[in-house]
Amino acid sequence: MTLIDLANPTRFLMLTARVLPWLAAATAILLAVGLYQSALAPDDYQQGATVKIMFIHVPNAWLSMFVWGVMSIASLGTLVWRHPLADVAAKAAAPIGAAFTFLALVTGSLWGRPMWGTYWEWDARLTSVLILFLMYLGLIALWRAVDDPSRAARAAAVLTLVGAINLPIIKFSVDWWNTLHQGASVIRMGGPSMDRSFLIPLLVMAVAFSLLFVTLHLAAMRNEILRRRVRSLQMMQASKQAA
């Protein structure tokens, strides 16, 4: 199965119909294992039990940026390579990315209340993630507001690529500015600084949430393809009746 084969919506539907049940099962198993390991992880000597919010917050924060990266690649596919499923992939990913970003903001606020004494600070990292969330909502609104799918796809692709500028700002904001948010402790020069008792559950949860994204994304793409087919049939039927 090549990328050219996957450009065919019918073949894509056939392939994902076989793959999705296995992906869903793997996601459920890894989430269960990750949650179990997270529950057994010890309390931190400074943060206490609050540290366990990290096992939900960090994967969602990672995926909030990763999904926008996926949408940016799909946007290039729309504008440059004219891939038939590129705009489907971008449109299907946006609500999922918005959900991950929302969960990252909420869990970060829940962690910030006992650690910083407030649910919110206009910190560089927090503010840039909030901007990312608003950009997700803006793209979703754009797709719903424009009736012509081709025009909506092109406009959304341009805005997605422009919005990708925010990704390095989010990633390096803790290095560029004096922020309350802690620096990287997993993906960093010199290797992870986190103890294994926290690192292993975190990585399991990160893989589980990544599989969750893949599963939800493929399912959403299938729904979008089928929705467009139904709309096309309805338009054909309406034109026949008008004639």
Regions found by a protein language model. Give the residues of each.
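Polytopic transmembrane helical bundles with strong interfacial aromatic enrichment
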Residues: 1-243
